[in-house]
Amino acid sequence: MDPILFIHGFGAGKKQYQPIKKYLKKKGINNFYEFDYDNKFGLASFKLTAKVLSNFIEENIEEENINIIAISQGGIIALEYLKYFKNKNVKKLFTLCSPHSGSMLANMAVLPGLVDLRANSKLLKELETFVRDSKIDIYSVYTPFDLMVFPGWRARSKYGKQKIVFAPTHPFAFWWPATFKFIYENIIK
């Protein structure tokens, strides 16, 4: 099994994806890496964080092929990495409630790392075009009740395979049983 790299979302850390990791371990998957980045203030641009991710992958992951499971903002960082810095063959990218089409909440932000998450931002349009043209094997999970990526449909990629889960909030969608099942069934293919 190719390794799985976890990337957390804005203001979070490694605890955010532990339930997913625990589920996958129970299913016999044990090859994991965790990218932890400082994002508490939204000061860094996505490109800068994607460069840090690229360095992390280069320095820590020996395997040639990897799968990425990225939560919320982590999904946008992963796409930025794939567009500009890809140094490994990413077989599959799973984004969980990532603001592919922006979030209305970002309209209130002025920090560089959050301004790029506004609906119709230049960055998100560029990443959408990149995903369309590069045919990345992408899987997106979203909930219509997401108040962080608002409205919730903005968290689905227009390309690849989508899974709607009826979790009551943004964080519950990461830990929803249907999310675990969707990831597992598609990662072992």
Where does each model-flagged region fall?
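Flexible, glycine-rich phosphate/dinucleotide-binding loops
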Residues: 13, 41, 102, 147-148, ...
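Serine-dependent carboxylesterase/thioesterase catalytic core
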Residues: 4-8, 15, 25-37, 43, ...
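Short amphipathic alpha-helix
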Residues: 19-20
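C-terminal catalytic-base region of ester-bond hydrolases, centering on the histidine
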Residues: 133-189
